[in-house]
């Protein structure tokens, strides 16, 4: 069983997250013995003020929660990181996305992350857009020789979800 822990809305004040309080979802997972986790993060401009909460601070927060999962849930936990707002993030902060992916790839060498997910939450992005995002994310992963999983979560709308999944598969095939 995998439990999703949403990092993007945890104690956000003035568009800066609470970096000290352990998310309630992680604490509950520990109580009941669950350990496979999807940590979700927003990288677009709507949730955080990245002038106050820098990409480096975001990466350190992810690293802290990942380490917390290994230390407190299970040393063999399968942890996925989900970029919840990839269309917004790629439109306004693609470099930010690539910085976080690069950081996670380097971290995965020692931490053994299971993989990455990116989400198209509105079902409005064209399959070619999602395919391009997947291609560049996978390229960063490949450049680091990280064989972690790359998954996509597309919400249904306008019939793009199936076409998008096929396009992403095509853009990352052979990797």
Where does each model-flagged region fall?
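Short, surface-exposed acidic/glycine-rich loop or hinge patches that mediate macromolecular interfaces
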Residues: 124, 157-159
């Amino acid at each position: 069983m995998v439990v999703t822990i949403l990092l993007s809305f945890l104690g956000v004040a003035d568009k800066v997250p609470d970096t000290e309080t352990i998310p309630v979802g992680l604490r509950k997972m520990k109580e009941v013995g669950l350990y496979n986790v999807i940590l979700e993060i927003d990288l677009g401009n709507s949730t955080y003020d990245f002038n106050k909460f820098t990409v480096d601070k975001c990466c350190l927060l992810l690293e802290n929660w990942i380490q917390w999962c290994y230390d407190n849930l299970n040393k063999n936990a399968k942890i996925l990181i989900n970029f919840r707002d990839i269309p917004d993030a790629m439109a306004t902060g693609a470099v930010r996305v690539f910085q976080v992916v690069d950081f996670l790839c380097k971290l995965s060498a020692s931490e053994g992350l299971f993989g990455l997910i990116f989400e198209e939450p509105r079902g409005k992005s064209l399959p070619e857009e999602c395919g391009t995002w997947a291609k560049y994310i996978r390229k960063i992963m490949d450049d680091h020789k990280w064989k972690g999983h790359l998954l996509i979560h597309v919400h249904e709308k306008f019939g793009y979800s199936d076409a998008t999944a096929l396009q992403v598969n095509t853009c990352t095939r052979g990797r």
